Swiss-Prot record:
Protein name per its UniProtKB record: Putative peptidyl-prolyl cis-trans isomerase jhp_0161
PANTHER family linked to this entry: PEPTIDYL-PROLYL CIS-TRANS ISOMERASE HP_0175-RELATED, PEPTIDYLPROLYL ISOMERASE
Superkingdom of the organism of origin: Bacteria
Principal EC category: isomerase
Origin organism lineage: Bacteria, Pseudomonadati, Campylobacterota, Epsilonproteobacteria, Campylobacterales
Source organism of the structure: Helicobacter pylori (strain J99 / ATCC 700824)
């Protein structure tokens, strides 16, 4: 799963990287995929129509993921990255051959990209300055004490749910479950979930509305509140409303809560307070810029 996510995330970075890549030495050369000693020693991983693909072409990835290190990748992962780089270069060459890079649409797109990149670069510089600021220990400790129960208690629940559009539908389903003896309630819940739920994942999987394990902050607040209030083997006797519709929840199991100590939570708290400070500084700076700018809004 993680590898697939990584590979998908790299595509955008590779594309941006090749926009600034070196031009081909000979556009008429056929595509080569060689591992000559001279190229390898120079850090050339492959060539496409004479244009080298090197480790520096993956620098954009490192900017997005500081832990990225090409040399530490497995051989298959390196090959997959190089193959993606080759595919990107081939498409880029074809687009240039069709002179798409000279069209007004492309130039307008590039201007928009450059503007956004400049804004993001400026924001990155502001964030770097904020990171240099030391968050007082007392402020972090106070934040922990005020938010311990909401943010720093780990507890997982394993539940099923049935999602329907209306409250009346939910009440009808609850009534059907109520009629069953205790030993058969979960089986009835599974049957009704497979038949009546409008949750597309549960409907397609026909898994009895099984949500797997989740923590409080992973679900809608009202859903989590209702689910964690149940005891294993019990279900909600009134419909639970969220933005998705009306839920009936059946609790399979619930772990005992584990509270993170201040020292365990400290890195997270520091990051959260730095993010808050960053947003405050950004808003403050933008307001300062607004005061000195001439802004006209046409209506």
């Amino acid at each position: 799963m993680k590898k697939n996510i990584l590979n998908l995330a790299l595509v955008g970075a590779l594309s941006a990287s090749f926009l600034m890549a070196k031009p081909a030495h000979n556009a008429n050369n056929s595509t080569h995929n060689t591992k000559e000693t001279t190229d390898a020693s120079a850090g050339v991983l492959a060539t496409v129509d004479g244009r080298p693909i090197t480790k520096s072409d993956f620098d954009m990835i490192k900017q997005r993921n500081p832990n990225f290190d090409f040399d530490k990748l497995k051989e298959k992962e390196k090959e997959a990255l190089i193959e993606q780089a080759i595919r990107t270069a081939l498409v880029e060459n074809e687009a240039k051959a069709e002179k798409l890079n000279q069209t007004p649409e492309f130039k307008a797109m590039m201007e928009a990209v450059k503007k956004q990149a400049l804004v993001e670069f400026w924001a990155k510089k502001q964030a770097e300055e904020v990171k240099k600021i030391q968050i007082p220990e007392k402020e972090m400790q106070d934040f922990y004490n005020a938010n311990k129960d909401q943010l720093f208690v780990k507890q997982e629940a394993h539940a099923r749910h049935i999602l329907v559009k209306t409250e009346d539908e939910a009440k009808r389903i609850i009534s059907e479950i109520d009629k069953q003896p205790k030993a058969k309630k979960e089986a009835k819940f599974i049957e009704l979930a497979n038949r009546d739920t409008i949750d597309p994942n549960s409907k397609n999987a026909q898994n009895g509305g099984d949500l797997g394990k989740f923590q409080k902050n992973q679900m809608a607040p009202d859903f989590s509140k209702a689910a964690f209030a149940l005891t294993p083997g019990d279900y909600t006797k009134t419909p639970v409303k969220t933005e998705f519709g009306y839920h009936i929840i059946y609790l399979i199991s619930k772990d005992s809560p584990v509270t993170y100590t201040y020292e365990q939570a400290k890195p997270t708290i520091k990051g959260m307070l730095q993010e808050k400070l960053f947003q405050e500084r950004m808003n403050q700076r933008i307001e300062e810029l607004r005061k000195h700018a001439k802004i006209v809004i046409n209506k």
